[in-house]
Amino acid sequence: MKFIEENCGVFGIYSKTQCADSIYQGLDFLQHRGQEYCGISTFDKEINHITHHGRVTNLFTGEELQSLTGTWGIGHVSLRDRQPMKWKTRVGEISVAFSGNVINAGELMEDMMNRGKSFYKGYDIEIISKIIIEKGDVVSGISALSEKIKGSYSLVVLTREGIYASRDIYGFRPLILGGNSESYAVSSESRAMQNMDMEIFRDVAPGEIVLINAKGFQTVKQLDSPRKAHCAFEWAYTASIDSIIDGVYVQEARNNLGESLAQRDIDEGGIVADIVAPVPMSGVGHALGYHKRSKINYQDVFLYNRYADRSYTQITQVAREKMAKRKLSVLPYVKGKKVVLCDDSIVRGTQILNKVKDLKKAGAKEIHVRIACPPLMYPCAFGISTRSEGELLARKYVKTGNILSMEQLVDLEAQIAQKIGADSVKFNTMDAFVKSLLIPRDSLCLQCFDGISPCKL
């Protein structure tokens, strides 16, 4: 099975005026979803198209943006490949960008190659595009994705008719509609539109295909959706804290997760600490929630380097460790303090180990690590950067992948605390985690925690 280290974001806009600057701005607000590649396509009689290796604001020049003429277009930020991808087809030029992961990419590519199709590198975006192109029209092509693809996708397709936006039938990855008097937009996160003076209209429904043009938003097809399976990791980590995903404020969900951790400490006899602190920036919302419930003073213990990339979305472990070191430096205030340190999750354990080590080296008296997510037990098949069971720290201690009792969880926490050098470690239980997200359990994908896929793989 293939597990792509993938985080990415899409943005599209149909405007009354030239749109390239707006797409550039929208992608900048989605940059946290992927920093390795970026691209913009616009339509003006034909598709204008530019992609880069690197960050949006570092690479697109004013001259390039001026060359991207047209009043509607799409953009993409990614960890893995260049998107959007432009195609000449029998229905005219199109450009395609998506967020997600095609699990059965190898099988689909082999089938297409046996039928005479060629591929550049076999990227998921090539497979998705070719499935769309094989059909007589874009709507039929997007519809065919639900029949052929195992995995997740939220996508935008640029055409002469406008922009088609669609979400897979489970709604794994977010996709939001919004706009103002000058434009209609679609984005992986609401923050892009909120910060561009746009109103948030609604989420694209699982299986919905929306056409965005001068008339606004038109649902041109609604595919049957077996169930919702929104990625729970969006609220815990992936999405920006100022976004709203499927009707839930990310900030509220993270505050709830922190409060839940504090409540568990209170229920288990309380904890004596001087300060509660986040691992920036992923632990901020959780730490604020913990502070609110516990009444322990909130205090930063790390100085965050805003110019460093997200370490979790770096491709290699060496790159992650180097980036993590660049991101954070310890504040001397920590000396002699008992610290509750909050973060979203423990994946491989390397980064939290180094942070605990740095804090103790700086003189912290005690470090109590509190983690918002339950232990990660399974690699994600649907697009988050975890590749194999062997890389997951919790799985090294729970070989079956199933935590069946509170006693088993407590034992795991003690083993991880010893491994990372912390005085204690606690995770949210699965029940507490789901309750904090304010979304029914049967509307979430929790596969990385419990190994249960919402669809047949």
Features from the language model and the residues they span:
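Conserved short alpha-helical segments that host acidic/polar catalytic motifs at enzyme active sites
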Residues: 1-206, 211-274, 279, 366
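Flexible loop/turn segments at secondary-structure boundaries
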Residues: 18, 104, 172-173, 193-194, ...
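A generic structural motif
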Residues: 37-41, 300-305, 367-373
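PRPP-dependent phosphoribosyltransferase catalytic core
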Residues: 161-162, 197-203, 356-457
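Active-site proximal loops enriched in glycine and acidic residues that flank catalytic Cys/His/Asp
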Residues: 167, 188, 214, 278-281, ...
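Phosphate/diphosphate-binding loops
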Residues: 192, 199, 207, 263-265, ...
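Feature representing long, continuous alpha-helical segments
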Residues: 255, 259, 263, 284, ...
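Short, glycine/charge-rich flexible loops or terminal/linker lids adjacent to PRPP-binding catalytic cores
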Residues: 289-339, 350-353, 377-389
